[in-house]
Amino acid sequence: MQLLDDDFLLDNDMAKTLYHDYAAQMPIIDFHCHLNPSEIYQNKNYTNITRIWLNEGTYGDHYKWRLMRANGVDEKYITGDGDDYLKFIEWAKTIENAYGNPLYEWTHLELRRFFHIDERLTAESAPRIWEKANQLLQTDDFKPRQLIKNSNVQVVCTTDDPASDLHYHQLLKPEEAANGFKTLPAMRPDQLMQIDRDGFGDYLKTLGKVAGVEIHDFATIVTALTQRFEFFNKMGGRLSDHSLLTYHFEEATPAELDAIVAKGINNAALSEHEINQYLTMLLEALMKLNTQFNWTMQFHINSDRDLNRPMFAKIGPDTGYDAVGTQPDIVNHISALYTKMQQTEDVPKSIFYSLNSNDWLELATMMGCFQGGTTQKLQLGAGWWFNDTAEGMTQQLQVFAQQSLLPHFVGMLTDSRSFLSYPRHEYFRRVLCSFYGRLVEQGRVPNDAAELGRVVQNIAYNNAHDYFDFF
C-alpha cells in the first residue's frame, strides 16, 4: 500500500465500502475547537504556510512544537522570532523523522486535501512545497471562511470566556447563509473556576460588568453566570467546556462558600479544601444551568499542565509542556458530583474526555448510572490530545461500544487552532469504518453494508446534528 492511498487505514473490504460509500461524504459538525472567531470574520489570507500551520508568535500548533523540540530545533524557530521560511525548513526536517506519529499522517493529509501536493515533506522537498503552498495561500480558496466551507463544515464551535462580548460571533451571525456554516460560541469558564489564581477578583469585576451584576458573593456569581448563559444561548451557544486537571468532591455551606469567595476576591491564601469546596459548588451551579438551557457539558480531565516551569514563565500556557495526568480517583469524585445532582434531576447532557486512557472504562461504566431521558445523554468523548491516534481512537470506540451504545456516539472534533485540521474528521471516519469492518470479519455484527453505513453516517454527522440542537 502506498502512503495515504485511497484505502489507507481501511484494512478490510467492509471498511472500504463503509468509508467510500457512506462516511466520506457526510458534512462536519466541529463542536469543539480553538479557532479564533476574529480570524473567521476578518477572512484574511495567511502570509505563508508557517503562519497557518506552525505559529503566529506563541499561538499555534503545540503538537508540532513538541516534535520540533524533540528533533533538537532551537526555540527561535519554534515559538521565537526566527524567519518563517527557516521555521518551515525545521518542521520539514522534523516530520521526515516522524514515521508512526499521527502528525506524519495529518501533515501529508493536509498537503493533499488542501494543496493537492502528493510529494512527501522532507528537507529536500521543503523549498518546492513552500513555494507552491504559499502561492495557493494567496488565493480566495485559502481564506478562512472558504477553507471551512470547502471542508464541508456546517458548524464551528469556538471556545469562549463567559465574559466575552462575542463581538465577532455577532458580526458573523447575519452572514451564516452566505458563509454556508455557523460560527457558534461555547462557554469555557476557566478563569471563574481558578479561584486561587492571581487576578480572580479583577476577573469577577470584568464578568460582573458585562453581566450587569455587582459580584460580591457566590449568589451574585451565579446571577452573572445565568445572564451569560442567556446571552450565549441567544447567540446559538449549546455547550460549555470545563477543564478539571484534578478534582475532589467537597461541598460547602452558603456561609463557608461566601467566605471562600471573599478570600478569592481579596487574593488571600486558600487551602486545597477550600479550593475544592468552591469548585464543587460552582460545578453544581454550572450543571443546573446546563440542564436549564439544555446545553451539553464537556469535561476535559486528568491533564498535567505546564510541567516545564521555566518555559511556562517565558512563553506562557498551551505551548507544548503538558502531559497525561494521574489522579487515580478523579472519576470517583465526578461520580459523587453526578450522584448529588441526580437528586434534583440536574444532570445535563455530558461528554467526558480524559487524557489518561486508564480512566475510560471507569468513566464509561459511571455514565451508565446516570443515563435516561435523552438518547445517550452521557457520552465518552473521542480520544483526546495524546490519544488522538488511530490506536487511541480505536480503544475509545471499543470501550464505548462495550459499555454503552456506540451507534449513538456524537463523534469527532478537531480541538484545533488551525483551519487546516479538518482532515482529522476523515482520519477518524476511516478508523471508525475499520472498527466496524473488523467486527464484521469476526462475525460479531451483521454483514450488512446498508445497516452499518447508516451507523457510521450517524456517528460522522447525524448524531451530533440531533444531540446538540444547533439547527
UniProtKB/Swiss-Prot annotation:
Catalysed transformations (reactions): D-glucuronate = D-fructuronate; aldehydo-D-galacturonate = keto-D-tagaturonate
Keyword Isomerase annotated: yes
Positions of disulphide bridges: none
Pathway(s) the chain acts in: Carbohydrate metabolism; pentose and glucuronate interconversion
UniProt KW keywords: Isomerase
Example GO BP: D-galacturonate catabolic process
EC number: 5.3.1.12
InterPro entries in the record: Metal_Hydrolase, Uronate_isomerase
Enzyme class: isomerase
Gene Ontology molecular functions: glucuronate isomerase activity
Taxonomy, superkingdom: Bacteria
Listed HAMAP family: UxaC (MF_00675)
UniProt similarity note: Belongs to the metallo-dependent hydrolases superfamily. Uronate isomerase family.
Listed name of the protein: Uronate isomerase
Organism annotation: Latilactobacillus sakei subsp. sakei (strain 23K)
Gene: uxaC
